[in-house]
Amino acid sequence: MYPVDGIRSQIEWNTTLNVSDAPVPTETTKYHRKTAIIATIGPKINTVEKLTDVRLAGVNIVRMNFSHGTHEYHQSVIDNTRQMIKNDPHGRPVAIALDTKGPEIRTGQTRDGNDYPIKAGDEFIVTTDPKYSDICDNKVLFVDYANLASVTAPGKLIYIDDGIISLLILSIDGMNLHVRALNNGTLSSRKGVNLPKTDVDLPPLSEKDKDDLRFGIRNGVDMIFASFIRRGEDVRQIREVLGPDGASIKIIVKIENEQGVANFDEILKEADGVMVARGDLGIEIPASQVFLAQKMMIAKCNIVGKPVIVATQMLESMTYNPRPTRAEVSDVANAVLDGSDCVMLSGETAKGSYPVQSVLMMAETCLLAETAICYPPLYDDLRAVQARPTETAETVAIAAVAAAAEQDAKALLVLSTSGETARLVSKYRPKIPIITVTRNEQTARQIHLHRGCYPFWYPEPRGVQNHQWQTDVDNRIRFGLRNALALNVIQPGASIIAVQGWKGGLGHTNTLRILTVPTDPADLELQPLGSL
């Protein structure tokens, strides 16, 4: 791999970093960011105008949180997002993600809706007996997981309300668990329950989740963020529910419990991508260990070339404040340095007072973090862990990234049908943009999951005769260059590496071309395919 200014180590590269020379996003550079931004859409920004604002600030994927809201509300998010996309002059795609509620465990309803204080040392009963489901107090607390008594044991812990209350199990008698409070707190209605170091046997989808997935299929969502995944079989069950009509929807698994971390390898084999969901994960395992789990999962995703998202509390203070804490900015930057493909905003955009500012801050931080990466040793590391021999498409992707470095090319341009070639090029983390052109509109949206990819949907019909093939290829290249120029991703006269197939369809990528971006706009006009 050709060195960056003669530097071939990350530590040496770090010595050259200069805050005075750090790039600041402007109208001409804001699209240079490689890391995608996911924003959760709440009522505050669920209008075409406000969605346009956050998109212009840097959002690539919108997230619908199905733990809240009705189908009618989420339909409005989909409709407003699609209208916003239509209004964009460059037609740049924005993906839509459905985040499932998942198989949560919760306490019951308190008696008369009251809150009940408890003190450290208090002892009471946690029960799965449904007759207590709506009369909970500080003597008997119902939990809606029927198998609780059979999967846990004395000496284990139960966490209530995001870990605010810790309960130690003293003994078990049928459906009743005798527990002791380890700290002061307040018992309220319908609070979340976590069971650390316990193998929970809940199904991956509730009936509500299945209904939500059917809603997503009808509306053509691009990806599912599947909550509380614990084992590889969970992913297979979700695929069965999606069925043929939802086969093209990407399944991004959320790892947010100890089981998911322990079974990560088998889950990764089944999933299309991973979200490091640090909220619940930081309850189930010690908070001090979350960063280790994050680094492990990101590394394993990078090695196999599957997208990975880092989420939860990234700029949490910007929900209410116009500026983030320094620690939050470092958290976003370190997620990028770790190798994440996407970073996510939750309450910051869903209910926050500063949604646009939150996106702008995340976009600027990602852009700066990307400049702190020394790409040659990163490429070498990724090559070193890749088993040989490689498949043809991956061999071409490796060669394209290496050729771009040797040529000092300013972009790679990938023609892709399914997005697989773009994924493979992204896997080797080139320092330059990956302009991706595809005829599949959903593929164009899904490609945002992969770092460095700038997707464009090519709407023109395919040339079906052999003599039309090269003209069709050249037209798609011109289309990609024209759109990339419009967004200042590349400049006229720049050298680029084009990656294409030798014929149409899937699985035929085997060709590299070294091209120069035309300086005359007329050279980017699409050519007629001729008579069929």
Swiss-Prot record:
Annotated binding of ATP, by residue: N65, F66, S67, H68, R106, K191
Binding site for substrate: R63, G279, D280, T312
Sequence similarity: Belongs to the pyruvate kinase family.
Gene3D superfamilies named in the record: Phosphoenolpyruvate-binding domains, PK beta-barrel domain-like, Pyruvate kinase, C-terminal domain
Single GO MF annotation: potassium ion binding
Quaternary structure annotation from Swiss-Prot or TrEMBL: Homotetramer.
Binding site for Mg(2+): E256, D280
E.C. number(s) listed in UniProt: 2.7.1.40
Entry cofactors: Mg(2+); K(+)
Organism: Agaricus bisporus (White button mushroom)
Pathway: Carbohydrate degradation; glycolysis; pyruvate from D-glyceraldehyde 3-phosphate: step 5/5
Name of the protein in its database record: Pyruvate kinase
Keywords recorded for this protein, A-Z: ATP-binding, Glycolysis, Kinase, Magnesium, Metal-binding, Nucleotide-binding, Potassium, Pyruvate, Transferase
Domain of life: Eukaryota
Site (Transition state stabilizer): residue numbering on this chain: K254
SUPFAM superfamilies, per database record: Phosphoenolpyruvate/pyruvate domain, PK beta-barrel domain-like, PK C-terminal domain-like
Keyword 4Fe-4S: no
Catalytic reaction list: pyruvate + ATP = phosphoenolpyruvate + ADP + H(+)
Residues that hold K(+) according to the record: N65, S67, D99, T100
